[in-house]
Amino acid sequence: MSACGRKALTLLSSVFAVCGLGLLGIAVSTDYWLYLEEGIILPQNQSTEVKMSLHSGLWRVCFLAGEERGRCFTIEYVMPMNSQMTSESTVNVLKMIRSATPFPLVSLFFMFIGFILSNIGHIRPHRTILAFVSGIFFILSGLSLVVGLVLYISSINDEMLNRTKDAETYFNYKYGWSFAFAAISFLLTESAGVMSVYLFMKRYTAEDMYRPHPGFYRPRLSNCSDYSGQFLHPDAWIRGRSPSDISSDASLQMNSNYPALLKCPDYDQMSSSPC
C-alpha cells in the first residue's frame, strides 16, 4: 500500500468518525425519532379527523395536535395527570421506547473514546496500537447502536401487532429524521472502525518488513575480546578448514621438529649440519 493511499485512507476514516459522531450526537439530543398520529374515521364520507399528533425522541414527546398542542413532556411523564390520551397504544409505544434508550448513549460514549484515540494515533503515527484500539471502539459503538435501533423498531412493531383493531379509529406512525441520522451514523461508524483496523494491519506489516531478524547477528563474546568483532560479520564466522590450511599446519610442525641449529667452532656462520 502506497504512502499516498495510506494518507487518503487515514483522512477518510477521520472524516467518517467526525460525521458519525456528529450525526449520533444530533440524533440523541433531538425529538424527531418517531411521528405518531391518532384520530377517528367519520362514517359519513370516510374522512379522518386527527385527535392527537406528536413527535417523540429518546427523552421528550411534543404534541402537534390535540388538547396539548405545542407542549412537550418527558418520556417518563408523557402528559399531565388531568389529560386523557386518545388511545393506550400511544402510551405503550412511548413506554417501550425507554428500553432502547441506553444503547444509543453507550454507542455515543464508545464513539467519543474511539474518536479521541484515533486523533492521538494520527498525531503520533509510531503508536500503531492506537489505530487498532480506536477501530475496536468504533466497531463496538456501531454494534451498540444497531442493537438500540433494532429494539426501538421491534418495540413499536410489537405494540402495533398487539393493538386492538377498530374500524372507527386509526393509528399511524413513521420514523423521523433523527432516526435516519442514527442509522447513517451506524454505517459511518462501522466504516471508520474497519478502516482503522485495516490501517493498523498495514502499519504493523510494514514495521515487521523493515525490522531485522533477531537471529541474524551473533552475540559478542565481550567488549574486550579480540575475537568479538568477528561475530558482527557473518563472513568472519568459523568455517570448516580447507586442505591447504591443513597442509600448511603440517609443514610448520615438521620444521619445528628439525634438529636445533649447531655452531661450528671454526666458522662464525651458523650451520645446521654437524661439524
From Swiss-Prot:
InterPro entries: CACNG_subunit, PMP22/EMP/MP20/Claudin, VDCC_g5su, VDCC_gsu. Keywords: Cell membrane, Membrane, Postsynaptic cell membrane, Synapse, Transmembrane, Transmembrane helix. It comes from the Eukaryota. The keyword tRNA processing does not apply. The chain crosses the membrane at residues 8-28, 103-123, 129-149, 181-201. GO terms for cellular component: AMPA glutamate receptor complex; glutamatergic synapse; postsynaptic density; postsynaptic density membrane. It is found in: Membrane; Postsynaptic density membrane. Its main location: membrane. It is a multi-pass membrane protein. One of its GO terms (biological process) is regulation of AMPA receptor activity. Brain. Enriched in Bergman glia, as well as a variety of neuronal populations including locus coeruleus, olfactory bulb, lateral septal nucleus, interpeduncular nucleus, and the CA2 and rostral/medial CA1 regions of hippocampus. The L-type calcium channel is composed of five subunits: alpha-1, alpha-2/delta, beta and gamma. Acts as an auxiliary subunit for AMPA-selective glutamate receptors (AMPARs). Found in a complex with GRIA1, GRIA2, GRIA3, GRIA4, CNIH2, CNIH3, CACNG2, CACNG3, CACNG4, CACNG7 and CACNG8. Interacts with GRIA1, GRIA2, GRIA3 and GRIA4. Belongs to the PMP-22/EMP/MP20 family. CACNG subfamily. Regulates the gating properties of AMPA-selective glutamate receptors (AMPARs). Modulates their gating properties by accelerating their rates of activation, deactivation and desensitization. Displays subunit-specific AMPA receptor regulation. Shows specificity for GRIA1, GRIA4 and the long isoform of GRIA2. Thought to stabilize the calcium channel in an inactivated (closed) state. This is Voltage-dependent calcium channel gamma-5 subunit. The gene is Cacng5.
